[in-house]
């Protein structure tokens, strides 16, 4: 399988997806036809989100079709060379994909060789479940099971920082809560600016920041770019 799982879409001082374009170009390998899954973008229309994505990828020669705009979404996915899943609210994303019957077709086409690109919520959707999202559960997705394209859980936008005077939990504390009730999980705290690529059977960490892996009963393990999972 070929996956590009990004923690986030925007970095300080850079345009939207600018940091991801070289990574996307490297993994295209001749693929040019993409379907875009825009449903996580709650505060923007599907048309606007799709147009924004299409404009960014046009210089790479990639044509983007919003899955919401086609007559037969399942057939469009089955024939796609690239599946792109945008960030936003993970619960809304999973709900819409489940209701529209898109989860199995996405899994199947990626396993057959299509490239999967997802940022933030799109990276969460590639995991076994969405239980490591940071998002508010604004809708009920009728279960947390997701695509299971990547075998570990990703927590995108990972940071352990708290504003001065803030008394809420750190991100690690919230991850530790999940590991109490689901000790079988391995959770990757993927900070902004980092990504995971899957190619030729290998998953590789990229990006300038330290990533952390959490397991029940163990100290967090720091990982740097180049680590293979």
Swiss-Prot record:
Record field: catalytic activity: Dipeptidase E catalyzes the hydrolysis of dipeptides Asp-|-Xaa. It does not act on peptides with N-terminal Glu, Asn or Gln, nor does it cleave isoaspartyl peptides
Active site residues of this protein: 120, 135, 157
Any one annotated GO CC term: cytoplasm
Location (main, coarse): cytoplasm
CDD domains assigned: GAT1_Peptidase_E (cd03146)
PANTHER family per the UniProt record, alphabetical: ALPHA-ASPARTYL DIPEPTIDASE, PROTEASE S51 ALPHA-ASPARTYL DIPEPTIDASE
Function according to Swiss-Prot or TrEMBL: Hydrolyzes dipeptides containing N-terminal aspartate residues. May play a role in allowing the cell to use peptide aspartate to spare carbon otherwise required for the synthesis of the aspartate family of amino acids.
Family from the record: Belongs to the peptidase S51 family.
Name of the molecule in the record: Peptidase E
Organism of this sequence: Shigella sonnei (strain Ss046)
Gene coding for it: pepE
């Amino acid at each position: 399988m070929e996956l590009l799982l990004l923690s986030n879409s925007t970095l300080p001082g850079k345009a939207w997806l600018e940091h991801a374009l070289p990574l996307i170009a490297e993994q295209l390998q001749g693929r040019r036809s993409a379907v875009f899954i825009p449903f996580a973008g709650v505060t923007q229309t599907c048309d606007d989100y799709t147009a924004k994505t299409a404009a960014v990828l046009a210089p790479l020669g990639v044509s983007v079709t919003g899955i919401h705009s086609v007559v037969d979404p399942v057939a469009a996915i089955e024939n796609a060379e690239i599946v792109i899943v945008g960030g936003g609210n993970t619960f809304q994303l999973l709900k819409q994909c489940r209701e529209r019957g898109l989860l199995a077709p996405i899994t199947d086409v990626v396993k057959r060789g299509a490239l999967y690109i997802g940022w933030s919520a799109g990276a969460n959707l590639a995991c076994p479940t969405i239980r490591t999202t940071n998002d508010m559960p604004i809708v009920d997705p009728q279960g947390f099971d997701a695509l299971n394209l990547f075998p570990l859980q990703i927590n995108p936008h990972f940071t352990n920082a708290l504003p001065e005077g803030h008394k809420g939990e750190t991100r690690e504390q919230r991850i530790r809560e999940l590991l109490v009730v689901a000790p079988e999980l391995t959770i990757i705290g993927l900070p902004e600016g980092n990504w995971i690529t899957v190619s030729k059977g290998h998953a590789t960490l990229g990006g300038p920041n330290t990533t952390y892996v959490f397991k029940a009963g163990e100290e967090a393990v720091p990982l740097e770019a180049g680590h293979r999972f």
